[in-house]
């Protein structure tokens, strides 16, 4: 719906207030307009960012102060450890590599070659901005919280602190962004659904593999996902912003 169509609706709904503050009414109409990305889509993404940051802050606080979260982490990790099998361990050990630095950087390089060949320079810039950003914040989080990894149950040796999960954060950011770009280029809804579902499944499996292999707690993976979502939202905003030339009528002012 266009902002020009929303203004009369807001005037009817809010009456005196809307007529007294016409500039505010136009601003609200622009924020709810579906005609431009800077309208309702950007509003929803900004709200999603606020909710995600708030949830991430809550999780981070709870791993320090909440005995309940620590207990849930311990119980869930121990339950998976008790049911661990060699076949599934081998499967998840191979799968968890999709969140490793070597594989994600390799995929990023391959994507960069494709973007360079097709001269999609902004995609190239957005990709590495997100990769560097999420990597820096993972390092910052690990150093800030210095949370030890699960004791004596890891399927393989791994160093460093536990919160947040770098594999989960990077998988959410990289595969989420590439999946989003891919679905945007597809015309058939069915194809979009398949690509979107495959992307989500891969991200979830990478995160679950970290818990199953005993190298992260549940809250570590959740924190990694939330951090990755923040950067993914930034990537989506930058993508759509550069595709849409803002109309002065729909500016953020």
Residue ranges of model-derived segments:
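Membrane-embedded catalytic cores of phosphoryl/pyrophosphoryl-handling enzymes
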Residues: 3-13, 154-253
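Residue-level signal for helical boundary/lining positions with a hydrophobic bias
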Residues: 95-96, 142, 163, 216
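Hydrophobic alpha-helical segments and their boundary regions
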Residues: 46, 56, 62, 88, ...
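Terminal transmembrane helix and immediately flanking juxtamembrane interfaces
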Residues: 1-123, 222-253
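Membrane-interface loops
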Residues: 64-65, 70-75, 106-197
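Juxtamembrane membrane-interface segments at transmembrane alpha-helix termini
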Residues: 85, 136-147, 206-211, 234-239
């Amino acid at each position: 719906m266009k902002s020009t169509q929303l203004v009369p609706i807001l005037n009817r709904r809010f009456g005196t207030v809307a007529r007294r503050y016409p500039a505010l009414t136009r601003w609200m109409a622009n924020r709810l307009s579906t005609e431009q990305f800077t309208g309702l889509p950007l509003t929803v993404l900004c709200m999603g960012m606020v909710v995600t940051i708030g949830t991430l802050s809550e999780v981070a606080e709870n791993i320090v102060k909440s005995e309940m979260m620590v207990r849930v982490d311990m119980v869930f990790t121990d339950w998976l450890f008790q049911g661990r099998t060699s076949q599934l361990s081998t499967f998840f050990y191979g799968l968890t590599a999709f969140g490793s630095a070597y594989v994600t950087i390799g995929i990023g390089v391959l994507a960069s070659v494709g973007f360079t060949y097709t001269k999609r320079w902004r995609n190239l810039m957005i990709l590495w901005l997100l990769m560097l950003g999420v990597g820096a914040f993972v390092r910052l989080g690990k150093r800030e919280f210095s949370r030890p990894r699960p004791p004596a149950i890891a399927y393989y040796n791994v160093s460093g602190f536990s919160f947040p999960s770098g594999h989960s954060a990077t998988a959410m950011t990289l595969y989420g962004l590439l999946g989003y770009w891919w679905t945007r280029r597809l015309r058939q809804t069915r194809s979009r659904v398949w690509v979107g579902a495959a992307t989500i499944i891969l991200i979830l499996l990478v995160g679950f593999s970290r818990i199953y292999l005993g190298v992260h707690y549940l809250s570590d993976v959740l924190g990694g996902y939330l951090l990755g979502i923040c950067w993914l939202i930034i990537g989506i905003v930058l993508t759509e912003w550069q595709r849409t030339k803002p109309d002065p009528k729909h500016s953020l002012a």
